């Protein structure tokens, strides 16, 4: 993202303007923002207060139309959760514990209803590969996990899950890719729906970079 509010890609330098934005009085207290595939339900996690919040967009995919809290859920953890991700079905949620370098797994007895969240007593440590993980992502069927060290190594690591979406069955594939020349800090990344593209955020350069697989 450059100073004109445009996103540029690494492959072909295409860009587009960011027309919508949203500000909150406590914006910087959010460590993670998740959007349900319906484009209506928004889930916000505040790392400092350990509070997961659910809100709705009155206009799908338009963040300016976000409403007030519908419900919230306090996550009881001794670490600091810096990022969170749902699985595709909305019945699992995963948190990246940047204090202990683990990914912790929770279940929702009613999909997408955070008031039904319980800890599965399942976690996976990435400390053998990365001491400062900044982001993670799953592939579409939950059989692969990807973790990136945003500020220290700037390396993405690949893991396999023996049982899909069960974080306790993860194991390192001995596969990695370095983004060390990209930026001084790469805080986040995401894949496209088919897994053929990776989009990596560069903090210092205020850019989003596109890679092909």
Regions found by a protein language model. Give the residues of each.
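Polar, enzyme-active/binding microenvironments
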Residues: 1-213
